[in-house]
Amino acid sequence: NEGKLRSYLIEITANILRHKDKTGGYLIDKILDAAGQKGTGKWSVINAMELGMPLGLIATAVFERSLSAQKDLRRLASKQFQCQHTQPIYNKAELVKNIFSALYASKLVSYAQGFAVLQRASDAFDWHLDLASIARMWRGGCIIRSVFLNDIAAAFEAPDKPKHLLLAPYFREEIKTLLSGWKSL
């Protein structure tokens, strides 16, 4: 949870992964792998679809949570499709670098898609949203607060506002440097 990845969700994930229970075992090994939903992701995806906007990463997360909730079906299927596990061959340093690239690029794309949906809604409903102000407001404390919200605010405050956040110079260059590692996974 340092540098470019610093965010609330990474922070709480790291805390969960590090936490040990009373017996000294990791808590993560005792958490049921069946997630529920409150509906905000689903609502976001439905709204994006109604506006004709892609929100692929969030949609995938919603679908994966739905699949996660089907624990009995997954258990049954895993018995039907057992395979021989092999030891993966990889360079640990390269793997860590590629995971960083994939995670950071995915976060950038997810935020870019979300802000594109906000812009489309603002245009469609004549809301006159100030996307830079929204980014600054989210920095202060919400579930999606992240260190690069500063860069998002700066992009929307630039004299030549981008048509899409990924086309803003900072984000374009970040994605270019991350693309190879992201694709390798």
For each predicted feature, which ranges?
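C-terminal substrate-binding/catalytic lobe of Rossmann-fold NAD(P)-dependent dehydrogenases
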Residues: 1-185
